[in-house]
Amino acid sequence: MSEPRQILVTSALPYANGSIHLGHMLEYIQTDMWVRFQKLRGNQCIYVCADDAHGSAIMLRAEKEGITPEQLIANVQAEHSSDFADFLVDFDNFHSTHSEENRELSSLIYSRLREAGHIATRSVTQYFDPEKGMFLADRFIKGTCPKCAAEDQYGDNCEKCGATYAPTELKNPKSAISGATPVLRDSQHFFFKLPDFQAMLQQWTRSGTLQDAVANKLAEWLDSGLQEWDISRDAPYFGFEIPGEPGKYFYVWLDAPIGYMASFKNLCARRPELDFDAFWNEGSKAELYHFIGKDIVNFHALFWPAMLEGAGFRKPTAVNVHGYLTVNGAKMSKSRGTFIKARTYLDHLQPEYLRYYYAAKLGRGVDDLDLNLEDFVQKVNSDLVGKVVNIASRCAGFIHKGNEGVMVGGDAAPELTEAFLAAAPSIAEAYEARDFGRAMREIMALADRANAWIADKAPWSLAKQEGKQDEVQAICAQGINLFRQLVIFLKPVLPVLAADAEAFLNVAPLTWNDHLTRLENHTLNPFKALMSRIEPAKVEAMVAASKEDLLAAEAKAPAGNGELAKDPLSAEIEFDTFAAVDLRVALIVKAEAVAGADKLLQLTLDIGDERRNVFSGIKSAYPDPSKLEGRLTMMVANLKPRKMRFGVSEGMVMAAGPGGEEIYLLSPDSGAKPGQRIK
């Protein structure tokens, strides 16, 4: 017998900024099935994952909710962990990229790349939000498409005409965060010299590590010549600061795949039999597999292996890529109720229904998978309840009633037993190749043969005939043995059904090699229903609940075109949070334009016993700043001073409006005095 394989498996890291939906679950379910198959075969197979917990989106959402990014990612991780567990996804470790292990490994890999000459630095020009004091990623810039003039389009592509462009080509650009008009600024950035690994990647991507369709797509990138990859972002940013570079942070996609290593390292600290170096060092004999969606192939099949190569670590054995999920033949839709969250599904249906349906439709390619809800009901009810479970329910009663639950010995259908044994290698081969659909078809073909044989023997008719009891017991014992074989073959897909079947069969947890044996003169436990049919009404209720999720979200934003519709209310905060903000009346002593800044005014504010210097992006509404002098306004007086290019800003004045010329500086009623607290 060959030695057990050492295998490390990962799924792509879910982003810690939202809920898991059924599209996400396609990946985690297929990975889990493959891992369970390997463990069933006796291999050492470790499955790790983590939340992808860095980036501007997380920083900004936390700010909007009035919590820290650390609190946000902790809340999301708890939600994700619960959803995965209830879908029977059995990680050996589910960690976070915001961890000390990931910080250390990211710094190590960066340092090795830099020392080997694979890091370049140069100045880049980007849009900068003067109000938020941050550089803007493409998705945080909106404006008018330069091609078709559609408004409210993102900084890199138009959703209306499909055009792609540079953010600087966008007309009337606005910050999607503050509404301010962004300005162009230069910043020093760090780049990974991906072209250094062109030859290695051309060979590696054609070495059997990828499906042919994926390798062919990557060849387009490789043939056109690889470009250096920007791996840095400027503060403010939620992530890891680059060693020795204050105010510069690793781009989220730099440390995200390193999160695979970090999660495994975290697991190694709890399981001393695992050796991190044995899995990750160059020359490792362990196998490493990444399961990912086709939207992130470039990161995993170009950037990631190049980073590993340059830093002296091993590369993946294979990157297994899958397609997207559609529902009822179309993209998931919130309005149609087909954008279904994992928790919404679990509130209505059993997880194994979906696990089986995904398995039945998954091939080894990158084609999209369609969840047809009508077919879903029919297939699960027909295959699992009508075929597999039906065998046990047909036979168990006769054994308990006629022989006190004891299965007789002997083989009532040697040709059928041989057919089941002969099918095992092909089913195993399909599982290994991730061709789950083929495996399910072969298993259901066996179930059809078993049911046809039982129907032909008709033990229910024989039981009514004198002297036929031995034949009834032989038929039903054979039926239970065939059922047991099917359970073994389906165990990677249906772990709960398998556990319940093991309890009924009165056996220890089944392994793959148990299909080579039979139960004879063996006592069964009383049979209990192993799976119920899907009720179409429950599927309809799930879709309705998904629509309600959308309506609930819309209810928080008022209908119509009022100001709240344009700028919805932020999340509720506690009174203590509000009380921490010190609002004061301020007298504008001096107001003047700032040289070199299109939108800023420099205000000198009197707050009673002291004066403050404040920079404010209100110039577009107040082109003659001298008219503001002598006016009372309101300011946030305890805001931490912020160093800007033009000086230090010691607070923030309060204004309303969407921006541009529509900015309205707030003023207290007459009689208020500078320095008075606003309550």
From Swiss-Prot:
First-listed, main subcellular location of the protein, grouped into a coarse class: cytoplasm
PANTHER family for the chain: METHIONINE--TRNA LIGASE, METHIONINE--TRNA LIGASE, CYTOPLASMIC
Subunit field text: Homodimer.
Gene3D superfamilies: HUPs, Isoleucyl-tRNA Synthetase, Domain 1, Methionyl-tRNA synthetase, Zn-domain, Nucleic acid-binding proteins
InterPro entries (UniProt xref): aa-tRNA-synth_I_CS (IPR001412), Anticodon_Met (IPR041872), Met-tRNA-synth_bsu_C (IPR004495), Met-tRNA_ligase_1 (IPR023458), Met-tRNA_synth (IPR014758), Methionyl/Leucyl_tRNA_Synth (IPR015413), MetRS_core (IPR033911), MetRS_Zn (IPR029038)
Protein name in the entry: Methionine--tRNA ligase
BP term (GO), one: methionyl-tRNA aminoacylation
Organism: Pseudomonas putida (strain ATCC 700007 / DSM 6899 / JCM 31910 / BCRC 17059 / LMG 24140 / F1)
Binding site for Zn(2+): C145, C148, C158, C161
Motif 'HIGH' region, residue numbers: 14-24
Binding site for ATP: K334
Residues of the tRNA-binding domain: 577-679
Gene: metG
Motif ('KMSKS' region): 331-335
GO molecular function (one): methionine-tRNA ligase activity
Keywords, comma-separated and alphabetical: Aminoacyl-tRNA synthetase, ATP-binding, Cytoplasm, Ligase, Metal-binding, Nucleotide-binding, Protein biosynthesis, RNA-binding, tRNA-binding, Zinc
Classification via CDD domains: Anticodon_Ia_Met, MetRS_core, tRNA_bind_EcMetRS_like
Database matches in SUPFAM superfamilies: Anticodon-binding domain of a subclass of class I aminoacyl-tRNA synthetases (SSF47323), Methionyl-tRNA synthetase (MetRS), Zn-domain (SSF57770), Nucleic acid-binding proteins (SSF50249), Nucleotidylyl transferase (SSF52374)
Family in the record: Belongs to the class-I aminoacyl-tRNA synthetase family. MetG type 1 subfamily.
Disulfide topology: none
A Pfam family of this chain: tRNA_bind
Assigned GO CC terms: cytosol
Cofactor note: Binds 1 zinc ion per subunit.
Matches recorded under NCBIfam families: metG (TIGR00398), metG_C_term (TIGR00399), PRK00133.1 (NF001100)
Recorded catalytic activity of this chain's protein: tRNA(Met) + L-methionine + ATP = L-methionyl-tRNA(Met) + AMP + diphosphate
